């Protein structure tokens, strides 16, 4: 897939100059998402950088005018920041701040305001007696949570301080992305009267890790099934989608005795890599996952892992990796541009994404339509600038994987 690019607004200014923002009233950048814990005070910032004299602030929630006085909220003194004193689930939504200044009406990006939570049933302890020499797994059901929690497996000494937990396992043992703990084979070394295998979860909703389940391996039994140690699939990644710029992992976990070390190929080419490479199977999992330290668009393709431990038939698994990208600025736009009347100006804002983003523009917080502004491959061009062209120009780019918003103040002298 080609990495498409949209030249939304040119990265060069035709006429005019960029000046320090501290001389002009511009909004401070806001995050795309703000999380809150129920009943914990939380702030949605809206602050003018530069001259904030005579600024009037207002908010919208889900596209409608928002009267903070009718809710359990307040505005910070001398700024437009919205303070939720005891936020509730009903406060969730998409918020946007507006600042009316002598230069025009500035608008923030749309901010997603979401409750963070982690709901888990009381942890239970289960006793297990697996079959010696056979592949095995310990299940950990993922909790109902937002955002997605970090799942961690540990060996915990009964009655000991959790800070003393052991997190480094034998190379036979690897946690899968589904939350489960996989044993390539079980041995008597996995049996313990004093240690438990503990699965925990943590996200922004909690200060400490939450225990989801505990296991005690009390012993092992003999294998009478005739299993000879040939590779059997435990967890293998299916067709998957990855975001450009993210860390990505392709899993190829097979139980076997002796343990087999997967080899990875992309479109038939070896991609095992070395430990220092961007793509490598050398990441403390004995090759059971292929690590992309930073995912790039050109990583898209068909990947195959092959496992052969010398016993039975070699195993092979293939999947398609599709790479997508939220909108991203190729060059950061200018916050302030000063131009003289009668001159031409191009406002910079160049965006890329997979798929190509949809772009909309605004002028003083209203949709930009018609008028004398012209969209070209090099940007938003205004020829023969007039005093009425001054104000805040917003560039918003969206696709199904995210959005970007930047606003430029055009000052006409």
Curated annotation (Swiss-Prot):
Residues 25-112, 122-211, 233-322, 327-413 form the Ig-like C2-type domain. Glycans are attached at residue 283. Induction: By bacterial infection, wounding, or bacterial cell wall components injection. SUPFAM superfamilies: Immunoglobulin. It is found in: Secreted, Extracellular space. CDD domains: IgI_1_hemolin-like, IgI_2_hemolin-like, IgI_3_hemolin-like, IgI_4_hemolin-like. GO terms for molecular function: axon guidance receptor activity. Hemolymph. It comes from the Eukaryota. Disulfide bonds join 46-97, 140-199, 252-305, 349-395. Pfam families: I-set, Ig_3. Keywords: Disulfide bond, Glycoprotein, Immunity, Immunoglobulin domain, Innate immunity, Repeat, Secreted, Signal. Residues 1-19 form the signal peptide. The keyword Lipid biosynthesis does not apply. GO terms for biological process: homophilic cell adhesion via plasma membrane adhesion molecules; innate immune response; synapse organization. One of its GO terms (cellular component) is plasma membrane. The keyword Signal applies. InterPro entries: Cell_Adh-Cytoskel_Orgn (IPR050958), Ig-like_dom (IPR007110), Ig-like_dom_sf (IPR036179), Ig-like_fold (IPR013783), Ig_I-set (IPR013098), Ig_sub (IPR003599), Ig_sub2 (IPR003598). Insect-immune protein. Forms a protein complex at the bacterial surface. Can inhibit hemocyte aggregation. Belongs to the hemolin family. This is Hemolin. It comes from Hyalophora cecropia (Cecropia moth).
């Amino acid at each position: 897939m080609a990495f498409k690019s949209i030249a939304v607004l040119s990265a060069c200014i035709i006429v005019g100059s960029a000046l320090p923002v501290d001389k002009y009233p511009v909004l401070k950048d806001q995050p795309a998402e703000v999380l809150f814990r129920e009943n914990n005070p939380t702030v949605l910032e809206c602050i003018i950088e530069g001259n904030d004299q005579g600024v009037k602030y207002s908010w919208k929630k889900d596209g409608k005018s928002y009267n903070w006085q009718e809710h359990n909220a307040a505005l910070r003194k001398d700024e437009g920041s919205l303070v939720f004193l005891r936020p509730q689930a009903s406060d969730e939504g998409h918020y946007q701040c507006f600042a009316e200044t002598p230069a025009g009406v500035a608008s923030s990006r749309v901010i997603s305001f979401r409750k963070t939570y982690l709901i888990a049933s009381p942890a239970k302890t289960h006793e297990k007696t697996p079959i010696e020499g056979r592949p095995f797994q310990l299940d950990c059901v993922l909790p109902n949570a937002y955002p997605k929690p970090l799942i961690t497996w540990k060996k915990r000494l009964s009655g000991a301080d959790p800070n003393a937990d052991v997190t480094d396992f034998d190379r036979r043992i690897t946690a899968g992305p589904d939350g489960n703990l996989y044993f390539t084979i079980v041995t008597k070394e996995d049996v313990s009267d004093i240690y438990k295998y503990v699965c925990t979860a943590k996200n922004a909703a909690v200060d400490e890790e939450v225990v989801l389940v505990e296991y005690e391996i009390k012993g092992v039994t003999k294998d009478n099934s005739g299993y000879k140690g040939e590779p059997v699939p435990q967890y293998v990644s299916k067709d998957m989608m990855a975001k450009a710029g993210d860390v990505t992992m392709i899993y190829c976990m097979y139980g076997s005795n002796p343990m087999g070390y997967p080899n990875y190929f992309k479109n038939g080419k070896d991609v095992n890599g070395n430990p220092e490479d961007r793509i490598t199977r050398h990441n403390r999992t004995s090759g059971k996952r292929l690590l992309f330290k930073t995912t790039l668009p050109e990583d898209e393709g068909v990947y195959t892992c092959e496992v052969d431990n010398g016993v039975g038939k070699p195993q092979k698994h293939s999947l398609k990796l599709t790479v997508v990208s939220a909108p991203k600025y190729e060059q950061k736009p200018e916050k302030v541009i000063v131009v003289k009347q009668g001159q031409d100006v191009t406002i910079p804002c160049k965006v890329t994404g997979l798929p190509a983003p949809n772009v909309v523009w605004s002028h003083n917080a209203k949709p930009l339509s018609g008028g004398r502004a012209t969209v070209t491959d090099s940007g938003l061009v205004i020829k023969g600038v007039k005093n009425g062209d001054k104000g805040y120009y917003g560039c918003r780019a969206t696709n199904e994987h995210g959005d970007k918003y930047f606003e430029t103040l055009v000052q006409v002298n």
